[in-house]
Regions:
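N-terminal ligand-binding/catalytic initiation module
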Residues: 1-202, 432-442
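Adenosine-phosphate binding glycine-rich loop
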Residues: 2-24, 219, 331-443
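Predominant activation on well-ordered alpha-helical scaffold segments within soluble catalytic domains
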Residues: 8-9, 26, 33, 100, ...
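Active-site nucleophile and cofactor-binding loops and adjacent substrate-binding regions
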Residues: 69, 165-166, 201-208, 233-237, ...
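Glycine-rich phosphate/diphosphate-binding loop of Rossmann-like nucleotide-binding domains
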Residues: 192-195, 200-307
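Rossmann-like adenosine-cofactor binding region
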Residues: 263-361, 366
């Protein structure tokens, strides 16, 4: 059994009840085989065994009182995975599905994504099984204050800098930042995704979606093509989906689908992004509202967003949303590119099918790194006590995404897997991390 396979088997045995984590580790380590085989010093230093084991896992209870005066208790997590390249960096997810396996999978992916940005950031992730949907502002505030009362013991501007994620938007970040400042009596850039009035960065909201489009645009440019005239399907209707749609349309594409947890819409004339923003960002409504307010739009309950004829598909909702049958539908409908806006939205068998069918597949750790890259830029602005313009941040974001594309592309060519951006992104992210870990000794 090879070194890589033995580590994967060990991870499966130790983390048997964490399928998402096992999936992420298997995908990454399998793609690293050519690099590992070329560098026996990695095995000698136990590098893979150390990379798959978090440096620290914090799990804690989060008690809070609802509007009826009843005590509620949730479970909070922070997985500090790897600090070799900088302070731990990664979002806080608030969703009923959150468990240790999901947070570990997200934290593991984050190490490589952050490495790819070339900014000084390690990898981590956190969250809680709390659902902010249907809660009052007062309930969300009490939860966030309780959550941060424990989390603040483990984070800091030079230690661990959390950010937003699913369920954690500007409101939640604001409540958490206020509580951190109150307890620690220090104003520092301990969270990113903050409001513009207290240290946030312009273009942070748009960053992941815009960055995804910049990544795909660079691929198209290198192949003598553009977004002009392309038909695009997008899943989700949160920040990533909304701003990927906005930027794609600015570049001449026609986006025809969006979705949420209840169903999806098909607008053959192209999505009216202003209407989507009104429904999702202002009213916090369901995507079905869109079909009621616009002529010629189809609304369908449940799944099915990938059954439409498109050139480019952008899964931007959540992990494991694009299954094998969806991949088959995309190929049958002529999709040429699938780029992940969400974290690991495509199942492993769907990814393999897309690649074998000649579809250009762009993994989330590279394609959606714009969010964490702009978080890194927010950290820089906080450290300097400066605020950059939207145009400055957007230009830096585009530069980072272009560099990430070429890093993944070059790594794939170097190791004989040209055009395989999954392997290329994993190799490029891993090599920087591996060199730093070797330099810092067995820690």
């Amino acid at each position: 059994m090879s070194y890589v396979d033995s580590v994967i088997e060990s991870v499966k045995a130790k983390n048997a009840n964490e399928p998402e984590f096992i999936q992420a580790v298997t995908e990454v380590l399998t793609s690293l085989k050519p690099v590992i085989e070329a560098h026996p010093e990695y095995e000698a230093a136990g590098l893979l065994e150390r990379i798959v084991e978090p440096e620290r896992v914090v799990m804690f209870r989060v008690p809070w009182v609802d509007d009826q005066g009843k005590v509620q208790v949730n479970r909070g997590f922070r997985v500090q995975f790897n600090s070799c390249l900088g302070p731990y960096k990664g979002g806080l997810r608030l969703h009923p599905s959150v468990n240790l396996g999901i947070i570990k999978f997200l934290g593991f992916e984050q190490i490589f994504k952050n490495s790819l940005t070339t900014l000084p950031m390690g990898g981590g992730k956190g969250g809680c099984d709390f659902d902010p949907k249907g809660k009052s502002d007062a309930e969300v505030m009490r939860f966030c204050q309780s959550f941060m009362t424990e989390l603040c013991k483990h984070i800091g501007a030079d230690t661990d800098v959390p950010a937003g994620d699913i369920g954690t938007g500007a409101r939640e970040i604001g409540y958490m930042f206020g509580q951190y400042k109150r307890i620690r009596n220090v104003w520092e850039g301990v969270l990113t995704g903050k409001g513009l009035t207290y240290g946030g960065s312009l273009a942070r909201t748009e960053a992941t979606g815009y960055g995804l489009i910049y990544f795909v645009e660079e691929y198209l440019k290198c192949n003598g093509d553009t977004f002009e005239g392309k038909t695009v399907s997008v899943s989700g209707s949160g920040n990533v989906a909304i701003y990927a749609t906005e930027k794609a349309q600015q570049l001449g594409a026609k986006v025809v689908t969006l979705s949420d947890s209840t169903g999806w819409i098909y607008d053959p004339n192209g999505i009216d992004i202003a209407l989507v923003k009104q429904i999702k960002e202002v009213e916090r409504g369901r995507i079905s509202e869109y079909a009621k307010r616009r002529e010629g739009v189809e609304y369908h309950d449940g799944r099915g967003v990938w059954g439409v004829k498109v050139d480019i598909a952008l899964p931007c909702a959540t992990q494991n949303e694009l299954f094998l049958e969806d991949a088959q539908a995309l190929v049958a409908n002529g999709a040429k590119i699938v780029a992940e806006g969400a974290n690991m939205p495509t199942t492993m068998d769907a990814t393999e099918y897309l690649q074998q069918s000649g579809v250009v597949f762009m993994p989330g750790k590279a394609a959606n790194a714009g969010g964490v890259a702009t978080s890194g830029l927010e950290m820089s602005q906080n450290s300097e006590r400066l605020s950059w313009t939207f145009e400055e941040v957007d230009a830096k974001l585009k530069g980072i995404m272009v560099n990430i594309f070429h890093a993944a592309d070059d790594a794939a060519r170097e190791y004989g897997v040209e055009g395989d951006y999954v392997a290329g992104a994993n190799i490029a992210g891993f090599k920087k991390l591996a060199d730093a870990m070797l330099a810092q000794g067995i820690v």
